Amino acid sequence: MRMDTLDSQAADAAQEEEIQRKLEELVTLAKDQGFITYEEINEILPPSFDSPEQIDQVLIFLAGMDVQVLNQADVERQKERKKEAKELEGLAKRSEGTPDDPVRMYLKEMGTVPLLTREEEVEISKRIEKAQVQIERIILRFRYSTKEAVSIAQYLINGKERFDKIVSEKEVEDKTHFLNLLPKLISLLKEEDSYLEERLLALKDPALSKQDQAKLNDELEKCRIRTQAYLRCFHCRHNVTEDFGEVVFKAYDSFLQLEQQINDLKVRAERNKFAAAKLAAARRKLYKREVAAGRTLEEFKKDVRMLQRWMDKSQEAKKEMVESNLRLVISIAKKYTNRGLSFLDLIQEGNMGLMKAVEKFEYRRGYKFSTYATWWIRQAVTRAIADQARTIRIPVHMIETINKVLRGAKKLMMETGKEPTPEELGEELGFTPDRVREIYKIAQHPISLQAEVGDSGESSFGDFLEDTAVESPAEATGYSMLKDKMKEVLKTLTDRERFVLIHRFGLLDGRPKTLEEVGSAFNVTRERIRQIEAKALRKMRHPIRSKQLRAFLDLLEEEKTGSGKIKSYKN
């Protein structure tokens, strides 16, 4: 009996030692990884360690050691975050600038925002949806909404507004049928609005009993409910309804100013008849505005406070969704670098696409937000590149044609091993050779003359281009010497001979004149001028004179072949 007890104690000690060793193994693994999974705990612990109480003790022990226990799904998510963090760190290192560089700071700050699970995305979307419903409900209480809706409906009927910009198309099955119903809907709204105005004016009657007031208020509430139902039949997009809200806020400011004016006049009205008259006028003005709004001042203030609160909640939820998906923008934007826009510009354009995706996301369809947002972000980035990347803007459809031609050229080059001719490329794509040449010409990127060459920044591209309009110093010196020598030689001729040569060859202003034009200056015939010119040229060919000018023949030949013009030699 004693031996059995000793054997049992020895077995318990061995088992306890094994458990201790396994726990140490768990802690070591957790410290190496920074966490441990439930699957790893089950693998490491011995099979005998299977009761819930024992497992709980192990989990309590690990918690006391600050060891994080995760599910396998959490581990995969954590690995994905680490991978993204490394990518962001690499981008931050590659982005130029000092530690306070905006790109670096943006990437660093963005990396601290955790990603959302599908459940969290749905929860945020529900918050946005709830806020939008409440915003719409409050805005449609005001008579301003009726006037705005009727105005927009008239624009739709007359074709002055795009249907998809105003109406939520998912709510409308038949566009033609909807447009045919609009006139009837407008008529019903106007009737309800007139009825509402009549009841509001009737409430002002001081002779009304409490019972009549209660009856009128009840009728008013029913009228408002019917009006809101008709307004919802317009199926306006949420951003259009929010535009109605801008009218409400603008009117609210004028209400507050009028209320302040009334409060100031109340103090002075007791001892000043003029102030009392102004107070009465201000109160009448306030009443007219209350009728125009369809709400009393107190109701107006209460509704606006609620409207602002729900708008803040909507913005907060949208901001949370956007900030949690900024990494998605980075992952897409980095694929479009070196296409004419800076990385920061690509991020900004992608963020605008992300915000549009948040506005239009429908969580009930079942897909993840990132799947839906990818298309909006990509569209925003590619559209920005098409619109802004080039100095001379190329339409989006032409960008697609250029890409098609470039892809076709690349394919033919891989098949044939040489650059395809316009004829070969046109045959492959169904274009004429001239069309292919035109597309290639459009695809060329203009280069700024101020573009820096090299890393030093000391020289620009324009410094390496020849300016044919500027005279070289050697030519300028040569022509200056020729001009001086020509003056000396011409002085050896008579005044008439010198005048004829200067004007016949354009030595004065660079424009040669005809015999008739020179003859009119001397009032002689063309033949007489020709004789004077021939005599003067014979004198110029004399060795004494021609010897002085022969050295400049090369300069004159170069000038004739270069520009085809003769320079003037005027002082």
Curated annotation (Swiss-Prot):
Q: Where is this region: Sigma-70 factor domain-4?
A: 489-542
The protein's UniProt keywords, in alphabetical order, are: Cytoplasm, DNA-binding, Sigma factor, Transcription, Transcription regulation
Tell me the segments the record calls region Sigma-70 factor domain-2.
Answer: 321-391
One Pfam family hit: Sigma70_r1_1
The record's DNA-binding region positions are: 515-534
Record PROSITE patterns? SIGMA70_1 (PS00715), SIGMA70_2 (PS00716)
Instruction: Tell me the GO molecular function terms.
Output: DNA binding; sigma factor activity
Region (Sigma-70 factor domain-3), start-end ranges: 400-476
**What is the predominant subcellular site recorded for this chain?**
cytoplasm
Biological process (GO) annotations held by this record are:
DNA-templated transcription initiation
Q: Where in the cell is it found?
A: Cytoplasm
- Disulfide bonding pattern of the chain: none
UniProt signal peptide: none
SUPFAM superfamilies reported for this sequence: Sigma2 domain of RNA polymerase sigma factors, Sigma3 and sigma4 domains of RNA polymerase sigma factors
Where the record places motif Interaction with polymerase core subunit RpoC is 345-348
Domain of life the protein comes from = Bacteria
InterPro entries according to UniProt: RNA_pol_sigma-70_dom, RNA_pol_sigma70, RNA_pol_sigma70_r1_2, RNA_pol_sigma70_r2, RNA_pol_sigma70_r3, RNA_pol_sigma70_r4, RNA_pol_sigma_70_r1_1, RNA_pol_sigma_70_r1_1_sf
Oligomeric and partner information: Interacts transiently with the RNA polymerase catalytic core.
Function as written in the Swiss-Prot or TrEMBL entry:
Sigma factors are initiation factors that promote the attachment of RNA polymerase to specific initiation sites and are then released. This sigma factor is the primary sigma factor during exponential growth.
Report the family membership. Answer: Belongs to the sigma-70 factor family. RpoD/SigA subfamily.
Protein name, as recorded: RNA polymerase sigma factor SigA
Q: Which organism is it from?
A: Chlamydia muridarum (strain MoPn / Nigg)
